[in-house]
A protein has these predicted regions:
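Gly/Thr-rich phosphate-binding beta-strand-loop-beta motif of the actin/hexokinase/Hsp70
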Residues: 1-19, 109, 141
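Short glycine-rich phosphate-binding loop at a beta-alpha junction
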Residues: 53-62
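Short glycine-rich, Thr/Ser-proximal phosphate-binding strand/loop in the N-terminal lobe
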Residues: 9-36
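Acidic active-site catalytic centers that drive phospho-/nucleotidyl reactions
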Residues: 7, 60, 102-105
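Short, well-ordered alpha-helical microsegments
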Residues: 65-69
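Anion (oxyanion) recognition and catalysis
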Residues: 74
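Long, charge-rich intrinsically disordered scaffolds of nucleic-acid metabolism proteins
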Residues: 81-162
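Short, basic/hydrophobic alpha-helical segments
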Residues: 37-54
Length: 162
């Protein structure tokens, strides 16, 4: 069994593979945030073990950037753990040299999953996520219309004071 910690970023994610003993396997892997990048990532993992079911994945909830790789891995039937960044930050505090970079972050995420000391973040299905996004967009548009009405009335009152 291998644990893969993925540090999420806007353009390029960083992944570290760890065995159950806590030792890193190979070098960290850069993953472009594209479907081609995800396929290349899976190919690199298959060089370690041909059976993708021997890998468990962990990632932090970071904006919306984690959704694409999460969906890709879930569609492959992989076990994907989504954690709150606060949980990995607490483990980071145990290390003597507390420098922060993507490679170390991905290894820490893998270690959090390996140790099992995390609370899983629930992930809604695609329809619920789409509905959430539409609802947020509607609230944004309603606020914008209200703001434009207020600004228009202010201008009318200034131009035509009577």
């Amino acid at each position: 069994m291998f644990i893969v910690g993925i540090d999420i970023a806007k353009h390029t994610h960083q992944a570290s593979v760890m065995n159950t003993d806590g030792s890193l396997v190979g070098k960290s892997i850069k993953i472009p945030n594209t479907s081609v990048g995800f396929d290349s990532f899976i190919s690199k993992l298959k060089e370690i073990d041909r059976d993708i079911s021997h890998f468990e994945f962990g990632m932090e909830v970071t904006g919306h950037y984690w959704l694409n790789i999460y969906t890709h891995l879930a569609d492959l039937g992989c076990i994907v753990h989504v954690i709150n960044p606060v949980q990995s930050d607490s483990l980071r505090g145990l290390y003597i040299r507390q420098t922060k970079n993507d490679i170390k972050d991905s290894a820490i995420i893998a270690d959090v999953i390996r140790i099992g000391r995390y609370c899983e973040t629930s992930v809604s299905d695609d329809k619920m996520l789409a509905l959430r996004d539409l609802t947020r967009q509607r609230f944004y548009l309603v606020d914008m219309v209200s703001d434009l009405k207020r600004k228009s009335l202010t201008l009318i009152d200034r131009i035509f004071p009577e």
